[in-house]
Amino acid sequence: MLFRTLLGLKKMAVTGLLQQGGRDITAKMVYAAESERPAAQIRAMSKIVVSFTDDGRRGVAGAISRAISIVMRGISLRASVIAGLSEKLGFFAPVEFEDFVWRRFFAKTLPVDDRPHVLAAQYRVLPLAMATLHRLKISLSGLLRVKRFKKIETRDFDVFISQTPFPGVLSSNTKLIVRYHDAIPIFLPHTIKDRAFHHGAHYDALARNVRSGAYFACVSAATRNDLLKIFPEIEDRAVVIHNTVSPIYSEIDSPKELVKDIVSSRLFRPLAKKYKALSSSHADVFTRSRLNADQQDFEYLLMVSTVEPRKNHTSLVAAWELLRSRHNEALKLVLVGDLGWDYAEFVDAIVPWVERGELFLLSNVAAPDLRDLYKHAKVTICPSYAEGFDYSGVEAMMSGGVVAASDIPVHREVYEDACIYFNPYSVESIVGGIREAISLRNASETFAEYRRCAKRISARYTAEAISPRWDEFIQSVGSAP
């Protein structure tokens, strides 16, 4: 969404950067458009596409070859950092690879009307994965007295925007803007994945960016406040620019009957055999039969989030169980999102409900289908202990739903009055918040008033509302001494 928003700015030329998170792109880079050698250039770019998805090595021999390559490449990269050599950005033209660019990077979040715009853009490729850049610094920390990061050749660009603290050194003429989403790896390190690595990687890159004079575009005032607790000296370099929410989420007419079809077709199928109850053919058949046979109105609560400790799924399930036992035994719970980390205890707790066809864990739900789920849910619930922004509440507002959320600073900031708040540490408080939201939904006049408020607040997070802030900020950074 950010890239599409930036493409709409008229006063600057925007180039996209293609980079992997965890695995390097090992194909040979193309460094300039070569009109005289089209076949060779297309072949080279085709190999880059392959490298994004597959390194081509199979079986035991492939594993050995891969391991040797990783060791040799690691030695070479460490030497290049010590020598101060820069990594060049490759050139990538999407004109012959439109399907790859669209479906891999944009199709899940952008409407198809945006396809021509993102495919007309220019792209560069950074072959080193973000994880590689972090590990290079970490692996050299014991060898060098001063922490060093890999240099990246960016002299063709005035401004470089990174979606995380950037573990690299840009060319001297290029100014860095860090899109800062949250300080959770620092303030809630017990909730993150691969804690030691991600905590150290986040802090070290962030500290390097601060020292180098980087600017920070924080996704919320709450995130900016956390950042300034750590580095108060960057107050003048840190601004708030909220996230842009996809225009796919809008209030349209859709029959509630679609919900059962969406639920039955998107049932989660985990790889772990331990949780086969979530995906066995027996469970699938039972769930679909239960959905088809149930003549009652399909009433459900909705939560959209990866399953991980910070998101507070366990408390929500406990609250839902109380609601069922006290007030409405027919109330279902729909959870949309993949299994992240530290989820075993939670999954063990929900398996009986899944087997009974009362709780539904969904994955790979397309944005238009998610829009329908938001619209018809009794309440969309955002129970996290901490967030940087939290898209799901705004998406629900835009889609015509009602939102109940944990009473944390970022929710108060982003959702304002278009939300019912509860204490995320109290199951009884969650129950009370959900009941209040359901009552609001069921009262036509109150619901209409709520919807007017939700439309007004969610309109702040459209591209039309956010793009002027980016324009102003980038222009100011570009003109800064």
Predicted regions located by residue number:
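Carbohydrate transferase catalytic cores enriched for Leloir-type hexosyltransferases
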Residues: 1-481
